A protein has these predicted regions:
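Active-site loop segments of alpha/beta catalytic cores
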Residues: 1-235
Length: 235
């Protein structure tokens, strides 16, 4: 990595933060092995898994080593500034383009290596149905965060990751198009089948009226308060 222009530019930004702020506080999104490999190989990555599996494994090996080394170097610099981080995150935004069998064969071994290199791991899936991959994710060590979409089997996911911080990625289309009754039903289901958890309302379109945002906040507060009261009430 030494001498690589992109890495040197990144380190220069880190040093600028240190000079301006002292502690280097922040979290780098390292994407994931499959996301980064796609940026390098493009759509050919997927047919390569059938016709050129050794090429795919070589790319994944290079990406994995680079991610782990980059995280370690950044964390060493942050620790020197007084900020200690020990976790890793992977953003498997493209995982739904793989069958669960191909994920298990090609990607899981490298996701596992990233997880094993750090104290805990968080896994981001966008708003996809994560059901085909949950059994494989459950084989990763020390999963501390997991998110997925509403079409997933939420009860099964909660059982697979009982101690992880769970999040539900709620789509901006649903935020904009669903009725208040439908939103209420969704959030009630999320709380009952997946909670305690976070709900992520990402990428909200500017055309969504403020009233809808207030409705979402009110719903989350009301359901959260009720769930907390039930959890703390004497049996």
């Amino acid at each position: 990595m030494d001498g690589n222009p992109c890495w040197e530019q990144f380190l220069n930004q880190v040093e600028w933060i240190a000079r301006a702020n002292g502690p280097v506080v922040g979290f780098m999104n390292w994407q994931s092995v499959v996301n980064n490999a796609y940026r390098l190989r493009g759509e050919e990555l997927f047919p390569d898994m059938i016709s050129e599996p050794d090429r795919v494994k070589h790319i994944f090996e290079c990406v994995t080593q680079t991610m782990i080394e980059g995280m370690r170097r950044l964390y060493e610099r942050q620790k020197a500034s007084g900020v200690e981080l020990t976790h890793a995150t992977i953003s498997n935004c493209l995982v739904n383009l793989l069958s669960p069998e191909m994920y298990e064969e090609f990607v899981l071994p490298y996701d596992r290596r990233v997880a094993e290199a750090f104290s805990m791991i968080g896994v981001h899936n966008c708003a996809w149905n994560a059901d085909p991959y949950v059994p494989h994710y459950a084989r990763l060590p020390d999963v501390a965060y997991m998110d997925m979409g509403l079409e997933s089997d939420l009860e099964r996911a909660r059982a697979a990751f009982p101690t992880a911080r769970r999040a539900l990625m709620y789509t901006p289309m649903d935020v904009k198009e669903k009725t208040l009754a439908q939103l209420t039903a969704d959030l009630e289901r999320i709380a009952g089948e997946y909670g305690p958890c976070d709900v992520v309302f990402a990428d909200i379109d500017r055309g969504v009226p403020d009233q809808r945002i207030h409705e979402l906040i009110d719903l989350c507060e009301r359901i959260s308060d009720r769930s907390a009261a039930v959890a703390t009430s004497p049996t």
